[in-house]
């Protein structure tokens, strides 16, 4: 067993226990990338994204094409990041408008 065995599960468990405050920005991005990049160390990729774009906010604002300019970021990772960003914007917009959706079929 290597030192990195179980790393992903430990990171997921820490997030479930403690939330985002237990993580630096690149660490949150690293955990997100677990779901799009199953067999690579996502820590250096997360660092590369933050380094290229300057901040987590800028990473989330980047287009999939811009994200894919970072080595090892392919369509799955860029789509996941763009999807998380879109979901966040949609939720914030709904919260700001005071809109409450009880039944999505009613729209």
Name each model feature, range by range:
Residues 3, 7, 41, 100-104:
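Catalytic cores of large soluble enzymes that bind and process phosphate-bearing ligands
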Residues 27-33, 46-49, 81-84:
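Short alpha-helical scaffolding segments that buttress acidic/His motifs in well-ordered protein cores
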Residues 1-32:
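Charged, compositionally biased N-terminal leader segments and the immediate start
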Residues 20, 49, 56-71:
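A short amphipathic alpha-helix within small helical-bundle interaction modules
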Residues 33-60:
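Short, contiguous, well-ordered secondary-structure segments
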Residues 88, 92-107:
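Long, charged amphipathic helices and adjacent flexible linkers at domain junctions
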């Amino acid at each position: 067993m290597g030192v990195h065995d179980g790393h992903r599960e430990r990171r997921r468990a820490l997030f479930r226990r403690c939330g985002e405050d237990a993580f630096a920005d690149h660490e949150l991005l690293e955990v997100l990338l677990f779901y799009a990049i199953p067999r690579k160390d996502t820590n250096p990729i997360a660092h590369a994204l933050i380094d290229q774009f300057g901040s987590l906010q800028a990473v989330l604002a980047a287009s999939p094409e811009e994200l894919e300019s970072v080595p090892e970021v392919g369509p799955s990772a860029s789509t996941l990041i763009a999807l998380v960003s879109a979901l966040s914007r949609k939720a914030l917009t709904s919260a700001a408008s005071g809109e409450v959706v009880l039944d999505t079929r009613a729209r």
